[in-house]
Structure formats: C-alpha cells, structure tokens
C-alpha cells in the first residue's frame, strides 16, 4: 500500500457515491487508499469524504471511460446499477480490475441476467417469473404468472419503478411506472409471482482470498419495494439457515471475485427461495455498523484489498430504522438529534445528501438492545425523533 496523493498511491474509483459507498470510502482510507468518487450529481455522500470527485453520466460509455482513463485506478468499484456495464467489461479486458468482476457487475445489475443465472443455470429455487420488453409481452407475462404479482424494471434498485399488482386495475399503472421509474429509463421488466414466505433475509456473503465467510442473517421489513428497517440476527431454524448458505455460496462462487455480496432470500419454514443479489454492501446491512465488530463496509474494504477476513463477531441483538422524509429542498436540516441519541446503545447516521426531491432515504438510526424487538423499538423511536426541515 502506498501513500495517498503521492506517485505510489493505491487508487480506488467508485462508480456511484451514495451512503453505502461513503462508508466503504471511509474504511478504505483507514488503510491509506486514495479514493476517487464519481456520480451523476455533485456533492453526493461519498464525494464528501473522497480525495476528489467527478460529476459523470455513468450511463454514457464514452464519459465513463474518459474519467477512468484519466484517473487510472487500481480498482473500479461499482456502487449503483445505472452504469454502462458493457464498457466495464471492455475496460477489464484491457487490464483494469473491476470489483468483484465485470461479469458479476453486468449480471447482477440487470435482474434478467442474475435471475436466469440462478434459476436456469444453477437450478436454484426462485419465485415464478417472466420477462417482458413491450406492453404486449408484459400483458402476456401477467396472464401466465397470475395475480398477485410484482413488476420491477430489470435495471433499478431501492424500489424505484417497482409495483405490486393485486387486481386488474393495477396492471396498466404498474407497466407505466416501471417505464418511468427505473434508474436506466424505459426498458425490460420482470413480472414476478408472489412467494408465500414467513420472512425475508439478507445473507451477507464474503468472498475473500481465504474462502467464503457468512455474516449472521439479517431480517428486514420492506415497504414500496424499499427497506424500512432491518435487524440482526434473524432467528432461523438450522435447516433453513443451512439451505440459505448453500444457495448464497452457489451464487457467489459462480460470480467470483473478492468482496461482499448481499444475497436476498425468502424463507418459509425450512424452505428457501433465491430473490436477488447485489455484488457490494447491502442497504439492509447498515445495521452491521453496530451489530458486528467489522461492519459490512469494513469487510468489503478488506476483501477487495486482498486482506484476510477473520470470523466476524456479533455484538448482540441490533436494528436499523430508516429516516425517510418526503418533500423538496436543496438545504435540508435536521433537529431532534439529542432526543434520538438519548437512549444508551443508540447511534445515528445522517448521510449528507445535498437535496431532497420527493421521498428519499436521508439517514438511519441504529440500536443495540436486550432482544431483537427491544433493538427495533429503540431504532424506530430514534428515527422518529429526527425532524427534517425543508
């Protein structure tokens, strides 16, 4: 490892500069890494802690290549879906190193690629699904899958463009929202049948130089396609946990590379279904900032740098609750911090996002408790204490 801002520096470039990337940037800088952050807008969270930043349309392959060739990073770390991933494949072929790999990024940032890999190549259990690229194909897919179902753009995250279709009256609206709400604009959708599950988990799965390490399962509650709260550890029976690890291992081993993967799974009794996977820290994993001795961000930093990842120690029942205001402002301010942090074992992260347009995740409350329910209650109370001023 060299010295930041010197000729011998080890440089990491982040494609995307959100709150998850911000935490990884901080962890990398603990190891003396020089970090460059890029995104489509200025002053994004990770930009605020990086050594330097660039505003780039990451869906433009020419613009993306230009900034990468200018910076010549040792590692390229994609943080969001809206990236010209075929260009990353070309850059990797030219000698750049993409985390965890350009193939993994290309597959996982497109729901069609990863679902076909999991269900059709690896033979893993999933919900029933169809893909559609036109309105006519969509209507046919809805008829084949049957109601109720979920419609998602193949390129989106955090619930953007996602709808639940329970009645025929919802069908047309879901198609239109998928075409306008996805991060990459109009395009193909996945029509996904409901799975009758007891709960859903994120299994953080780390692929590093010494093998694969699993964190304790994270339970979470979704609303409108985005997570509202998460907790760790999620209680599971032994067989369900074993099957979850087998599914996660199969996916992560196939995708390869080093780093942390957030593997999303549905669980009912002893049965487990694969849902999705992200090749980077997961938003539900924000809870690991208090629940583990090494957060998912610290683990990711170690793994991508080729540093061994030891057994991760759990700190006890922990929870996170999202701060999710709705409004419009370019000068957001917050009150209620003293009240939010009054309880022992409670922490807060305000992400520093430069503007609020509509509904946006602006922070998260974190709590340790005597039980999962105690931790969840403390986190929810802390989150609700924060008042967002527009």
From Swiss-Prot:
What is the reaction catalyzed? Answer: N(1)-(5-phospho-beta-D-ribosyl)glycinamide + formate + ATP = N(2)-formyl-N(1)-(5-phospho-beta-D-ribosyl)glycinamide + ADP + phosphate + H(+)
User: What does UniProt give as the signal peptide span?
Assistant: none
Gene Ontology cellular component list: cytosol
- Give binding positions for N(1)-(5-phospho-beta-D-ribosyl)glycinamide: 19-20, 79, 283, 353, 360-361
What is one GO biological process annotated to this record? 'de novo' IMP biosynthetic process
Q: Please tell me whether the keyword Transport is annotated for this protein.
A: no
One GO term in the molecular function aspect is: ATP binding
Q: Which residues bind ATP?
A: 111, 152, 157-162, 192-195, 200
> Which pathway features in its UniProt record?
Purine metabolism; IMP biosynthesis via de novo pathway; N(2)-formyl-N(1)-(5-phospho-D-ribosyl)glycinamide from N(1)-(5-phospho-D-ribosyl)glycinamide (formate route): step 1/1
**Its job:** Involved in the de novo purine biosynthesis. Catalyzes the transfer of formate to 5-phospho-ribosyl-glycinamide (GAR), producing 5-phospho-ribosyl-N-formylglycinamide (FGAR). Formate is provided by PurU via hydrolysis of 10-formyl-tetrahydrofolate.
Q: Which PANTHER family match?
A: FORMATE-DEPENDENT PHOSPHORIBOSYLGLYCINAMIDE FORMYLTRANSFERASE (PTHR43055:SF1)
Quaternary structure, from the entry: Homodimer.
Protein name, entry field: Formate-dependent phosphoribosylglycinamide formyltransferase
Q: Which organism is it from?
A: Marinobacter nauticus (strain ATCC 700491 / DSM 11845 / VT8) (Marinobacter aquaeolei)
């Amino acid at each position: 490892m060299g010295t930041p801002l010197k000729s011998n520096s080890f440089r990491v470039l982040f494609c995307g500069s959100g709150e998850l990337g911000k935490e990884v940037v901080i962890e990398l800088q603990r190891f003396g890494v020089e970090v460059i952050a890029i995104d489509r807008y200025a002053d994004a969270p990770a930009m605020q802690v990086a050594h330097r930043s660039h505003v780039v349309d990451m869906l433009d392959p020419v613009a993306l290549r230009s900034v990468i060739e200018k910076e010549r990073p040792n590692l390229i770390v994609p943080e969001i879906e809206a990236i010209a991933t075929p260009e990353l494949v070309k850059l990797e072929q030219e000698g750049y190193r993409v985390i965890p790999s350009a193939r993994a990024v290309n597959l996982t940032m497109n729901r069609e690629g990863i679902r076909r890999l999991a269900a059709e190549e690896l033979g893993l259990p999933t919900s029933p699904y169809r893909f559609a690229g036109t309105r006519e194909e969509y209507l046919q897919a809805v008829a084949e899958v049957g109601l109720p179902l979920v419609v998602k753009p193949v390129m989106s995250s955090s619930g953007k463009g996602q709808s639940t279709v329970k009645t025929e009256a919802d069908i047309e609206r879901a198609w239109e929202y998928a075409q306008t709400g996805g991060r990459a604009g109009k395009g193909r959708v996945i029509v996904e049948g409901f799975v009758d599950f007891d709960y859903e988990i994120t299994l953080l799965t780390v692929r590093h130089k010494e093998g694969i390490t699993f964190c304790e399962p994270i339970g979470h509650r979704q609303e409108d396609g985005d997570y509202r709260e998460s907790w760790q550890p999620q209680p599971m029976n032994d067989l369900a946990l074993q099957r979850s690890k087998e599914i996660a291992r199969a996916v992560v081993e196939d995708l390869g590379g080093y780093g942390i993967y957030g593997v999303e799974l549905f669980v009912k009794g002893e049965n487990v279904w694969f849902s999705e996977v992200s090749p980077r820290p997961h938003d539900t994993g924000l809870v690991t900032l208090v629940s583990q001795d090494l957060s998912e961000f610290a683990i990711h930093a170690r793994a991508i740098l080729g540093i061994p990842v030891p057994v991760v120690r759990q700190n006890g029942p922990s929870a996170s609750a999202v701060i999710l205001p709705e409004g419009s402002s370019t000068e957001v301010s917050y009150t209620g911090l003293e009240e939010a942090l009054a309880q022992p074992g409670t922490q807060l992260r305000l992400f520093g996002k430069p503007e609020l347009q509509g509904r946006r995740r602006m922070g998260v409350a974190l709590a340790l408790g005597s039980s999962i329910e105690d931790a969840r209650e403390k986190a929810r109370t802390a989150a609700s204490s924060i008042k967002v001023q527009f």
